[in-house]
């Protein structure tokens, strides 16, 4: 008797995998290092980077015998050198050192810097034609179509590490592009899912940082509360899988167990499920095309009991609507969407604006940019970075009037 054939009879990967982790000191970095720590004989750590946490970075460098570490803050080189004294770990500081870390030879690179600051390092890895696990959605949103074209040109393989996109990536494998009718990414709805608009408007930083299911970095946690994160993810899905906005739906699913679903022409819907633990999509990327042993809890659906779903509310969460608008506008609008959101989130953290003003600042920045009529396709990383800077300046100009205006 022959069993039903499974995809690969033999593992595709033997031997040691060289890995680099950009943003090693963050939340995704931490989950990635946890998976590497579990099977140290499978991996050689090439390079690690962090922004300013020298002690954390040096600790990881020593534990994993990294060959090179980079801290983004150029003022911390002396501190990093001192922390690594007596080891043979090479080190550097500043943006160029982070880019150097990304460009060093590694079979697999985790791109987990937060924000558009991750774009140049991610591109440095992509340009080597290596495998890049992409957690840093802002870099994709900032670079637009251009990022994936550059990956294709370099022969790099992009593996989606964001949980929803990783779910889609897994589910998409069960059909062909022309058979796909739509994809659905789920959203927990965040801490304000059931709140009235007037209460969301006044939400405090502490309330925005209380995510019901996921433990993540500060920026993405605030983006989840505003649903800007889902907006960024709709754009991310569009660029990653070359989908039109009409082919991407969002479904609110408070339990965060079903992460993404793909609907095919025959009306089959294929979904990926798992505990809300980033180590699951990261493990998928780390092992790909094989599967490694995970570190997250096994899914116990009987214990969870109920999975519920609801339609997203584009009125209470205008950030989601704006993402579809930006995607339809194209020609750099998603770069502006991301940049304005980064400025707005920083202003909210600094308590310069109310929570409700985050989406207003993004909307005003987008409108003002569209009115100025400077839209053009992004042809290079420099175009994306220039537009990102232009949009940040525009958002900063609009910020005082948004801050002064009561809703
Ligand atoms: P985090 O804030 O915990 O970590 C960010 C990392 O980037 C840190 O190592 C930090 O030192 C580094 N960094 C920050 N600014 C930098 C700069 N200017 N230059 C160089 N390095 C810099 O964030 P996180 O939650 O780990 O998220 C990282 C990325 O992954 C984000 O793009 C986020 O949207 C995405 N993501 C995160 C999760 C999650 O569960 N945390 C899930 C999906 C996607
Ligand atoms: Mg996600």
UniProtKB/Swiss-Prot annotation:
Pfam families: DXP_redisom_C, DXP_reductoisom, DXPR_C. It comes from the Bacteria. It catalyses: 2-C-methyl-D-erythritol 4-phosphate + NADP(+) = 1-deoxy-D-xylulose 5-phosphate + NADPH + H(+). Its EC number is 1.1.1.267. It comes from Rhodopseudomonas palustris (strain ATCC BAA-98 / CGA009). Belongs to the DXR family. One of its GO terms (biological process) is isopentenyl diphosphate biosynthetic process, methylerythritol 4-phosphate pathway involved in terpenoid biosynthetic process. The lineage of its organism: Bacteria, Pseudomonadati, Pseudomonadota, Alphaproteobacteria, Hyphomicrobiales. This is 1-deoxy-D-xylulose 5-phosphate reductoisomerase. Keywords: Isoprene biosynthesis, Manganese, Metal-binding, NADP, Oxidoreductase. One of its GO terms (molecular function) is NADPH binding. NADPH binds at residues 25-28, 53, 136, 138, 217. It is an enzyme of class 1 (oxidoreductase). 1-deoxy-D-xylulose 5-phosphate binds at residues 137, 163-164, 188, 211, 224, 229-230, 233. Catalyzes the NADPH-dependent rearrangement and reduction of 1-deoxy-D-xylulose-5-phosphate (DXP) to 2-C-methyl-D-erythritol 4-phosphate (MEP). Pathway: Isoprenoid biosynthesis; isopentenyl diphosphate biosynthesis via DXP pathway; isopentenyl diphosphate from 1-deoxy-D-xylulose 5-phosphate: step 1/6. Mn(2+) binds at residues 162, 164, 233.
């Amino acid at each position: 008797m022959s069993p039903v054939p499974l995809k690969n009879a033999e593992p595709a990967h033997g031997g040691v995998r060289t890995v680099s982790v950009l943003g090693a000191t963050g939340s995704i970095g931490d989950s990635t290092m946890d998976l590497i720590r579990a099977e140290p004989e499978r991996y050689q750590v090439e390079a690690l980077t962090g922004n300013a946490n020298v002690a954390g970075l040096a600790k990881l460098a020593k534990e994993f015998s990294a060959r090179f570490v980079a801290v983004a803050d150029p003022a911390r080189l002396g501190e990093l050198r001192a922390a690594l004294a007596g080891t043979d770990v090479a080190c550097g500081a500043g943006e160029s050192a982070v880019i150097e870390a990304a460009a060093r030879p590694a079979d697999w690179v985790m791109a987990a810097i937060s924000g558009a600051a991750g774009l140049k390092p991610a591109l440095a890895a992509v340009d080597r034609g290596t495998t890049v696990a992409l957690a840093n959605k802002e870099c994709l949103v900032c670079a637009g179509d251009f990022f994936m074209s550059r990956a294709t040109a370099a022969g790099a393989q992009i593996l989606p590490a964001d949980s929803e996109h990783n779910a889609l990536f897994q589910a998409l494998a069960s059909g062909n592009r022309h058979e796909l009718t739509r994809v659905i990414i789920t959203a927990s709805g965040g801490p304000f899912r059931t709140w009235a608009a007037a209460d969301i408007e006044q939400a405090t930083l502490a309330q925005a940082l209380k995510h019901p299911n996921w433990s993540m970095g500060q920026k993405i946690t605030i983006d989840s509360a505003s649903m800007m994160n889902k907006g960024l993810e709709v754009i991310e899905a569009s660029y990653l899988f070359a989908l039109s906005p009409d082919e991407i739906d969002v479904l609110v699913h408070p339990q965060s167990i079903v992460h993404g679903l793909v609907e095919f022409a025959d009306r089959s819907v294929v979904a990926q499920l798992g505990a809300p633990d980033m180590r699951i999509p990261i493990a998928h990327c780390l092992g790909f095309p094989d599967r490694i042993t995970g570190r997250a809890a096994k899914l116990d659906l009987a214990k969870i009991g109920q999975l519920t779903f609801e339609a997203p509310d584009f009125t209470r969460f205008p950030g989601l609507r704006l993402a579809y608008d930006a995607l339809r506008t194209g020609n750099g609008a998603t770069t502006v969407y991301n940049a304005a959101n980064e400025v707005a989130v920083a202003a909210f953290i600094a308590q310069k604006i109310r929570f409700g003003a985050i989406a207003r600042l993004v909307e005003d920045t987008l409108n003002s940019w569209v009115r100025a009529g400077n839209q053009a396709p992004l042809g290079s990383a420099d175009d994306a970075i220039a537009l990102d800077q232009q949009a940040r300046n525009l958002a900063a100009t609009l910020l005082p009037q948004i801050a002064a205006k009561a809703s």
